[in-house]
């Protein structure tokens, strides 16, 4: 067990971040330090289905492109999240049945954080409409991930045929770009790197 205390509020202030984003950044920096120090291949986090659903709904509410709707990845660099299939309650029940300690972030009880308002108020309302809402949304997230792969492939194919990079210049074949549909999406994706 590794424990570290940090001044999240000061880090957030210095870096102009929300406390939640600062806490996440500090946590992942520390995970990477531990991974390197101890020679670990990776670090597993306890993110679960409820986190996945909450992340999707936060991004949906704030407005996002397709990449913001693919949810929390199972693997991202050296971070793996093997519990995304299980709900928080399933993990709590399993822990109790097997006499395992269950540890929860104390900030999860406060409604001052958007993710908690969604967990405590929005998701229960959606489950009144569909008791299997979490599982259904998880299936949707997996479908969006597949669609994102196709989307990125289409953008890359268009980039390879329309964008010519020479030295420090990007030349766009405008006539070919104007023939793409939907034009706004292609134009955004092709031009945003420049």
Regions of interest found by a model, annotated:
Residues 62, 66, 88, 127-131, ...:
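Alpha-helix boundary/capping and short turn/kink residues
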Residues 1-124:
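Core alpha/beta nucleotide-donor-binding catalytic domains of modification enzymes
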Residues 101-103, 132-137, 151:
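Short, structured loop/turn "capping" segments at alpha-beta junctions
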Residues 119-137:
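Conserved anion/nucleotide-ligand pocket segment
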Residues 34-37, 129, 194:
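Alpha-helical structural context
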């Amino acid at each position: 067990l590794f424990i570290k205390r940090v001044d999240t509020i000061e880090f957030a202030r210095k870096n102009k971040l929300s406390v939640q984003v600062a806490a996440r950044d500090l946590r992942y920096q520390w995970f990477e330090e531990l991974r390197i120090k101890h020679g670990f291949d990776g670090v597993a986090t306890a993110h679960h289905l409820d986190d996945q659903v909450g992340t999707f709904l936060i991004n949906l509410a704030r407005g996002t492109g397709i990449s913001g709707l693919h949810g929390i990845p199972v693997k991202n660099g050296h971070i793996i999240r093997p519990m995304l299939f299980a709900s928080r309650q399933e993990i709590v029940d399993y822990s109790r049945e097997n006499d395992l300690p269950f540890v929860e972030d104390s900030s999860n009880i406060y409604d001052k954080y958007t993710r908690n308002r969604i967990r405590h108020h929005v998701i229960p309302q959606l489950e009144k409409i569909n008791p299997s809402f979490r599982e259904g949304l998880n299936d949707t997230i997996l479908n969006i991930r597949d669609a994102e792969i196709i989307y990125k492939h289409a953008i890359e194919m268009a980039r390879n045929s329309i964008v010519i990079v020479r030295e420090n210049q990007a030349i766009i074949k405008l006539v070919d770009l104007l023939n793409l549909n939907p034009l706004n999406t292609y134009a955004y994706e092709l031009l945003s790197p420049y």
